[in-house]
């Protein structure tokens, strides 16, 4: 592909960003919007020769199914007689792998990336999608240091399980792969991804692999027995978390929900860690960590009124430009609504309680400040229940209303006819509205 060529009369193609066995990746610009994208060009003939067409189709279906602030977004797919083209979100910051090679990360910075990774995996697993090839090379960064999980070519959908409910194909890079996957037995996709996340966390802080040996058989044995040693500078809380994640027995390995409840994970991140990380760490990398892919945690302790303090990557999905639901025909199938408000937190909470009273909704408040609202009468699918969560994003508040039980159509109707009109006095912007 020649530099400055135009693809499908929609994208101006620029420099080459990378190259793989089956194609190349280019920087490009959308002619109509001016948006920067990455164009992944795949040679049809090459993938047909090796029988990978189904894998490409799977990657397309998965990337359309998974839309999350910490998953690299697929905007559209195009094709000619010779090539398939993916128009993808452009991750200007490059691979997390390269950032780790330039400088060590302290635990606070590593926690920032790990929370985003766990948030992305939690979302994917809730959609029945398992990555199966998580490693630093498949974790990209945008210009704001937001993590982007990429390369779903080896991913498995829940539908690909056998009758025993387990996956049976060994995938991934050996150094990051769970022992049950290497044994070629049936395995849980979610448990296998959790193991890979644990290896990535170790590498983020140690700057080398927990399981490494020049002899591949010896490395497999170390993985099977979870034989590793943490550096002295690891905190006790981090060691405890890794011990739970890098458990060779998948039945007792930590789940994502347990990871989110762990002491190390729940520690708040200083905003300066996000704004000043790039280029501010002077430690030099000395150890290898390449073996032979958020929304952030909502479980941080805050001062009263116990609001969550979010950073840039939490609110990226509020941007109209990132609201991709229209591409996939699900604009009216949402189970959550987001809006911002410039009113004080106390005023927003009072308004939500007034709304609940007017609609005859039962109100309960959880320990982490979430308001739980529920109808008193049964609907088509039981009682309609929703969570109202208020988060602080200076200089405004972010309010998320999420259906947790009941019929989606009833929720949409209540949102359109009752809730949104009643809250108009406190709404500044509503997700999906044109600015």
Curated annotation (Swiss-Prot):
Keyword terms, alphabetized: ATP-binding, Kinase, Manganese, Nucleotide-binding, Serine/threonine-protein kinase, Transferase
Record field: catalytic activity: L-seryl-[protein] + ATP = O-phospho-L-seryl-[protein] + ADP + H(+); L-threonyl-[protein] + ATP = O-phospho-L-threonyl-[protein] + ADP + H(+)
Active site: 133
The keyword Nucleus is assigned to this record: no
Biological process annotations from GO: signal transduction
Region (Activation loop): 151-180
Protein kinase domain: residues covered: 11-265
Region span, PPI: 334-363
Cofactor list: Mn(2+)
GO MF term (any one): protein serine/threonine kinase activity
Segments forming domain NAF: 283-329
Positions annotated to bind ATP: 17-25, 40
Induction comment from the UniProt entry of this chain: By salt stress.
E.C. numbers: 2.7.11.1
Major enzyme class: transferase
Source taxon at top rank: Eukaryota
Pfam families per record: NAF, Pkinase
Coiled coil: none
Function noted in UniProt: CIPK serine-threonine protein kinases interact with CBL proteins. Binding of a CBL protein to the regulatory NAF domain of CIPK protein lead to the activation of the kinase in a calcium-dependent manner.
Family per record: Belongs to the protein kinase superfamily. CAMK Ser/Thr protein kinase family. SNF1 subfamily.
Entry remark concerning the domains of this protein: The activation loop within the kinase domain is the target of phosphorylation/activation by upstream protein kinases. The PPI motif mediates the interaction with the ABI (abscisic acid-insensitive) phosphatases.
Protein name per the record: CBL-interacting protein kinase 28
């Amino acid at each position: 592909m020649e530099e400055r060529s135009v693809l499908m009369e929609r994208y101006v193609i620029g420099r080459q960003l990378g190259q793989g066995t089956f194609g190349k990746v280019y920087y490009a610009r959308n002619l109509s919007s001016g948006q920067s994208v990455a164009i992944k060009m795949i040679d049809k003939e090459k993938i047909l020769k090796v029988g990978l067409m189904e894998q490409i189709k799977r990657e397309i279906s998965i990337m359309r199914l998974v839309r999350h602030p910490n998953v690299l977004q697929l905007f559209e797919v195009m094709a000619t007689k010779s090539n398939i083209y993916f128009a993808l979100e452009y991750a200007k910051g490059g691979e997390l792998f390269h950032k780790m090679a330039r400088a060590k990360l302290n635990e606070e910075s590593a926690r920032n990336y790990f929370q985003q990774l766990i948030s992305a995996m939690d979302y994917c697993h809730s959609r029945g999608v398992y990555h199966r090839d998580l490693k630093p090379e498949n974790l990209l960064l945008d210009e704001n240091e937001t993590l982007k999980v990429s390369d779903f070519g080896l991913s498995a959908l829940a539908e690909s399980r056998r009758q025993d409910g387990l996956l049976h194909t060994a995938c991934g890079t050996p150094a990051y792969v769970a022992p049950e996957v290497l044994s070629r037995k049936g395995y849980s996709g979610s448990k296998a991804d959790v193991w890979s996340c644990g290896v990535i966390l170790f590498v983020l802080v140690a700057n080398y692999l927990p399981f490494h040996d020049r002899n591949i058989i010896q490395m497999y044995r170390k993985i099977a027995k979870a034989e590793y040693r943490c550096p002295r500078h690891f905190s006790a809380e981090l060691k405890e978390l890794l011990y739970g994640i890098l458990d060779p027995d998948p039945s007792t390995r930590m789940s994502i929900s347990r990871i989110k409840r762990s002491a190390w994970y729940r520690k708040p991140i200083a905003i300066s860690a996000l704004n000043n990380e790039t280029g501010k760490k002077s430690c030099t990398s000395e150890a290898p960590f390449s073996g032979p892919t958020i929304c952030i945690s909502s479980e941080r302790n805050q001062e009263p009124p116990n609001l969550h303090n979010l950073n840039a990557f939490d609110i990226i999905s509020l941007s109209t430009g990132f609201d991709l639901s229209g591409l996939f025909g699900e604009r009216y199938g949402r189970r959550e609504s987001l809006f911002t408000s410039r009113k004080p937190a106390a005023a927003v909470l009072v308004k939500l309680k007034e709304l609940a009273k007017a609609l005859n909704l039962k109100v309960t408040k959880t320990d982490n400040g979430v308001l739980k609202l529920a109808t008193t009468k049964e609907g088509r699918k039981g009682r309609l229940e929703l969570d109202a969560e208020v988060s602080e994003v200076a200089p405004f508040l972010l309010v998320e209303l999420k259906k947790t039980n009941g019929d989606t159509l009833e929720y949409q109707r209540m949102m359109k006819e009752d809730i949104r009109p009643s809250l108009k006095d406190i709404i500044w912007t509503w997700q999906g509205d044109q600015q």
